[in-house]
Amino acid sequence: MARYDLVERLNGTFRQTEHALATLTENLEQQPLLIARVFSLPEVTKEAEHNPLATIAVEQHLGKEAESLALRHYRHLFIQQQSENRSSKAAVRLPGVLCYQVDDATQAALENQIQHINQLKTTFERIVTVESGLPSAARFEWVHRHLPGLITLNAYRALTVIKNPATLRFGWANKHIIKNLRRDEVLAQLEKSLNTPRSVHPWTREEWQARLEREYQDIAALPQQARLKIKRPVKVQPIARVWYKGQQKQVQHACPTPLIALINTDKGMTVPDIGELLNYDADNVQHRFKPQAQPLRLIIPRLHLYVAD
């Protein structure tokens, strides 16, 4: 019965999210659009979904065309809504911003709507990742049994609302996931894998077991106090840097989906200055500040595991 109730909540929360998104997009369409600028990125095919991106060509859209793309993007939740050739694993991203003229009452209503949508999205993600009690490998099958074709990342992804920005500038962020580990923690992880033999394509179970044993010996040979670090690259992400003149403050936002900027004319606010997102080229990345990197030696490539020399 508890599992049935959880499925009911999963479906109910998702349907509420769909309805709330539909209501929001209808309400936004009724507001005076001051300026809209979004940037579509190339479609990632199924064959290329794991390939690193050296370049990204950006196509700019303005005005009502940009608004239409953005409002459709907010409701893009299923693979059935996209090309059959597009990867269902690669995130669908549409950086940019929609700027609407609002008064005090409209601003409060839209902010409440967006907050409600984000609460529903958080609840939905918690049902899937926590309350289901399922390991990550089993969640995909469980969710898609009840919501076939769902793009879970799009369902989780929150909407970002900003108020009265002075300027917006778009760019790209290169990041790494960093995690420090002790030698014995890595040994325990490898030992767990050794005790549950399986095959991993393209290796047989015996070949994979032999690889794990070599990795175990390599780690066991290190001093107990060796400093180990997982440094896994994350695919380049579009970002927005927002400047607030009154507060003399800049805030950086991840920008996989268009920001919603509310410009309150009751308070005398004006249209912000919006920059362009340039094409990404990994060979020409310029770092504002790049600290001296700690010397690291790669010891287990598949885990992106390094040892500090």
Swiss-Prot record:
Molecular function per GO: DNA binding
Keywords: Cytoplasm, DNA replication, DNA-binding
Cellular compartment(s): Cytoplasm
Record bears the keyword DNA-binding: yes
Predominant location: cytoplasm
GO cellular component: cytoplasm
SUPFAM superfamilies listed in its UniProt record: Replication terminator protein (Tus) (SSF56596)
Family affiliation: Belongs to the Tus family.
Protein name stated in the entry: DNA replication terminus site-binding protein
Native organism taxonomy: Bacteria, Pseudomonadati, Pseudomonadota, Gammaproteobacteria, Enterobacterales
